[in-house]
């Protein structure tokens, strides 16, 4: 049984981590911090956890966190990097659900997040936690940068094409049209997130530039093993009036080799042994409700024209897009079965 700390337990990803870990047979949450709710019983804030935990929120105490085997940071950007060095020096592993350890390019990090990186030496040795593509590195990692929710759908949606020995798509012409529920913006109060602003509404945001764009580009370059081939990639996120769920529609142009390839078979073979990636039959329609609450991503392919491919990827942004994937990474780091604590089936209806 490993000891777990969660920094930032009152946000949506923090409480989702707790919900998942309370069912984990080999992990016990010992520390759950909150800047504003210290001393308050967790079940008073989250009634779904009544009868499942007697934990209270506490102030952030680095010495208490050092007693844990692993600490998750479900905090705003910039928090994990302030504490990572002290924790790993004490032998504690770190999994950050914010962006502190996602981008290896410091210039891009500082541009998009508006802060200097506090521990570039730790960043250099950290591992990007896209589980299905970085398993062996994750097993050896001390610090994990958990991927963003949108980048998770994009990478898993494109990986079979980019990992192929042949160039199957035109990498400079990729268009990503992505939609997310409002929980992706976090739990903090803001005018744009209140009910009357979002109900009966559907809007694009970050059209001129979104923080996940440089993460997507850097990650795809690593998957493809090529630099500067995704300059023309377009990424536009949208906000839909639902709480959780994400659907990314990815448009690509096929090369001559791509036109001749059985792409359905390519995807099915690539993900044949993956428990948390479901390749649906061709021309299917993955629905966000089918993965609600589950650590699963569903993919479907359409080929409307001989030289065009459309990839649909659906996930729960709080689970496979955040906390579930973080626990998946924790399982690898400690030698557990990858699906420990993550066998839950999506909630439907």
Curated annotation (Swiss-Prot):
Broad class of enzyme this protein falls into: oxidoreductase
Active site: 149
GO biological process: L-arginine biosynthetic process
Pfam families tied to this protein: Semialdhyde_dh, Semialdhyde_dhC_1
Enzyme Commission code: 1.2.1.38
Pathway: Amino-acid biosynthesis; L-arginine biosynthesis; N(2)-acetyl-L-ornithine from L-glutamate: step 3/4
Keyword list, A-Z: Amino-acid biosynthesis, Arginine biosynthesis, Cytoplasm, NADP, Oxidoreductase
GO CC terms of this entry: cytoplasm
Keyword Acetylation found: no
Reaction catalysed by this enzyme: N-acetyl-L-glutamate 5-semialdehyde + phosphate + NADP(+) = N-acetyl-L-glutamyl 5-phosphate + NADPH + H(+)
Chief location category: cytoplasm
Entry's Gene Ontology molecular function annotations: N-acetyl-gamma-glutamyl-phosphate reductase activity; NAD binding; NADP+ binding
The organism's place on the tree of life at top rank: Bacteria
InterPro entries: AGPR_AS, AGPR_type-1, NAD(P)-bd_dom_sf, NAGSA_dehydrogenase, Semialdehyde_DH_NAD-bd
Location of this chain's protein in the cell: Cytoplasm
Biological role: Catalyzes the NADPH-dependent reduction of N-acetyl-5-glutamyl phosphate to yield N-acetyl-L-glutamate 5-semialdehyde.
Assigned protein family: Belongs to the NAGSA dehydrogenase family. Type 1 subfamily.
Protein's name in the database: N-acetyl-gamma-glutamyl-phosphate reductase
Gene designation per UniProt: argC
């Amino acid at each position: 049984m490993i000891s777990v700390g969660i920094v930032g337990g009152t946000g949506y990803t923090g409480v989702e981590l707790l919900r998942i870990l309370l069912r984990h047979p080999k992990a016990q949450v010992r520390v759950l911090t909150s800047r504003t709710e210290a001393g308050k019983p967790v079940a008073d804030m989250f009634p779904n956890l009544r009868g499942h935990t007697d934990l209270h929120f506490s102030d952030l105490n680095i010495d208490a966190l050092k007693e844990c085997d692993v600490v998750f940071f479900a905090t705003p950007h910039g928090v994990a990097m302030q504490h990572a060095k002290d924790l790993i020096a004490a032998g504690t592993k770190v999994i950050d659900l914010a962006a502190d350890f996602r981008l290896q390019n410091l210039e891009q990090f500082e541009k998009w997040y508006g802060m200097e990186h506090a521990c570039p030496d730790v960043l250099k040795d950290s591992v990007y936690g896209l589980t299905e593509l970085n398993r062996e590195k994750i097993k050896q990692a001390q610090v994990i940068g958990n991927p963003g929710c949108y980048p998770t759908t994009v990478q898993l949606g494109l990986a079979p094409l980019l990992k192929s020995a042949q160039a199957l798509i035109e990498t400079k012409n990729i268009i990503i049209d992505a939609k997310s529920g409002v929980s992706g913006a976090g739990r903090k109060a803001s005018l744009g997130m209140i009910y009357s602003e979002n109900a009966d509404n559907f809007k694009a945001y970050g059209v001129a530039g979104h923080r996940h764009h440089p993460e997507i580009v850097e990650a795809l370059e690593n998957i493809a093993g090529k630099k500067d081939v995704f300059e023309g990639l377009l990424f536009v996120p949208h906000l839909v009036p639902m709480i959780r769920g994400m659907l990314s529609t990815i448009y690509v142009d096929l090369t001559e080799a791509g036109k001749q390839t059985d792409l359905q078979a390519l995807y099915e073979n690539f993900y044949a042994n993956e428990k948390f990636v479901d390749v649906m039959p061709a021309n299917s329609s993955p629905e966000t409700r089918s993965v609600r609450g589950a650590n699963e991503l569903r993919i479907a392919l359409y080929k409307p024209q001989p030289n065009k491919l459309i990839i649909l990827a659906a996930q729960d942004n709080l689970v496979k897009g955040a906390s579930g994937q973080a626990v998946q990474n924790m399982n690898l780091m400690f030698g557990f079965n990858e699906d420990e604590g993550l066998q839950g089936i999506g909630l439907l209806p």
